[in-house]
């Protein structure tokens, strides 16, 4: 389900849905290292998508068992990537680690909060 944080908008709007979904799975039990590898691989795919002019989002809130059954997966689905050509203006907004992390829309712009680098580095 896309746009879960903005249910009143009934996203995606007709004709604006993603062109592809990639279900990222693991053949071994999920643990810390699987999650690290997941992050690296997904980031690489999203960077490549951006390089060729596409947008993408990670979907982590989904019914794993339903996806596994629907696509006859033997492996554990961990994340779904949604890839497509974006039509909306997106702006990143720097926030502190304690601010609200939910994305929002205002005046036709889709705002995506991102924690400041200074707040991510522990040292």
PLM region descriptions:
Residues 1-123:
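Acidic, surface-exposed loops and disordered segments
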